[in-house]
Amino acid sequence: MKKNRTAILKHLCACALTIAMAFVVPSAGYAAGTDTLGFGVGGPGTNVDAYGNPVSGVVAKGITVSKYQYRASAANGGIDWDTVKKSGVSFAMIRLGYYNDLDPNFVENMKGALAAGLKTGIFFYTQALDVDTARAEADFVLSQIKDYPISYPVAYDVESDTILQNGLTKQQITDQVKVFCERIAAAGYRPIVYANNEWLNNHLDMTQLPYDIWYARYGTVNEYPNRTIWQCTDHGEVPGIGGNVTVEYAFVDYGTLIPSDGWKQVENDWYYVKNYIHQTGWLTVGDKTYYLGADGKMVHDTTVNLDGKDYTFEADGALQ
């Protein structure tokens, strides 16, 4: 996530968080932390903003983690994901990294979150300066997540200073985001655009991007068109993790939007998932046999040669 937030914003957020924390018992170190925005504040099931005001419509509480949280927890043997889950966290957005530059703790974070029973999504920070690179970024992401049960969205973090420094126009940036999200969606995953208020209003044409929004705005304001996740602070405290943690609230039930098992359709293509993982190769469902390509798409209404033998598939994908 973008680290160079303005000094003014950080100062205001810090003040707000101090006010909120004045009304709770200070955390007693690593194992008993209570974050400033609702993980235990005000009692079980309470969701509050930086000023302690209730936040309505929250479906799930989550966190964002990367190598930074992993390293901050190293003295305690790494992130204690079981403790994280017990604190009320139900999903984690895991940092994948940059193009051809995987976060060094991506695998550990994914495995730890999944082993504890958390839902997982990923976020990827773009450095693309053209649509071809944005497309390549999407392909890189897909190559890294194909073997994991992704039950939350795949996020494109567009807050890139490199993009602005190179003078890309709003339309050029929008085109890049569109290409990335289309590629992710075509592969059967649910894309989401991560950005703050300035980027959404000044650097992207949101009328061309009909995707979920992961809204990064610290403090109290959490509403934006298509906002499904709100990132409300990067100074939360969560049991099981050392140091600051970025806290998220989800306002939709992704369990109903992203199927865990069975067939799912993306435009004209069909995929089959088991525990959120896209299946490939031969598949038997009931008394019918199907074949799913390397990209997970069901082969249908054609004849293909597989291992030297021709196979014909009906319009519904069933083997003749």
Task: Describe the function of each predicted region.
Residues 184-202:
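Aromatic-lined carbohydrate-recognition surfaces of secreted/lumenal glycan-active proteins
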Residues 4-30:
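Sec-dependent N-terminal signal peptides of Gram-positive bacterial secreted proteins and lipoproteins
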Residues 22, 30-31, 258-320:
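Extracellular adhesion/carbohydrate-binding repeat motifs centered on closely spaced tryptophans
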Residues 133-136, 199-207:
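Glycine-rich, charge-decorated loop segments at or immediately adjacent to ligand/cofactor-binding or catalytic sites
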Residues 32-82, 208-260:
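Functionally critical loop-and-helix segments that line ligand-binding/catalytic clefts
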Residues 120, 190-192, 213:
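Hydrophobic anchor at the start of a short beta-strand
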Residues 35-181, 185-187:
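Substrate-binding cleft of extracellular glycoside hydrolase catalytic domains
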Residues 142-156, 160-162, 204-226:
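Structural recognition of alpha->loop->beta junctions
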